[in-house]
């Protein structure tokens, strides 16, 4: 089996490294196409101010054309895997994945909406920003073929939060390095 880990996933956190190591240990061939959008950003919820947000937006704007081109030209994998955080990656990956008939899986790991709105209360739950974030994440979850979190409890919570079909979200434990 060949898996292509694709996108702007955060290499500063161990999650992607652990998944790759586990897949390789299981005999799965793993290739990577990655853009370092999150380099130097430890806590994504702390990207504040116009300059910080514009810098991140510019990184994305420059990353996606190259990522998309490389994905379109890469040898066809059996599975296209999007790493955490991946909300925007899901839209691009599923577009190309559908054209190339490649199933897309997303390691959601942590819901952005749940973290920013419900847990940290950084924006009002009924505000327009919260509604936009909820809608964006819900649409991303519905586009991918497979979504998974770090635990079954989180998977069930995401299903309820985003009105997904029961048992539609799986779980893969984080593990240790």
Named regions from a protein language model:
Residues 74-80:
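Short acidic/histidine-rich motifs immediately flanking catalytic phosphotransfer sites
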Residues 68-69, 95-99, 127-147:
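Membrane-proximal helix-turn-helix segments that form the acceptor-binding/catalytic region
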Residues 80-116:
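An aromatic- and histidine-rich active-site surface loop
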Residues 153, 175:
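Carbohydrate-associated surface elements
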Residues 37-70, 121-128:
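A short, charged, and often flexible helix/loop element on the N-terminal side
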Residues 82, 149-150:
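Short beta-strand scaffold positions
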Residues 1-41:
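N-terminal subdomain of nucleotide-sugar transferases
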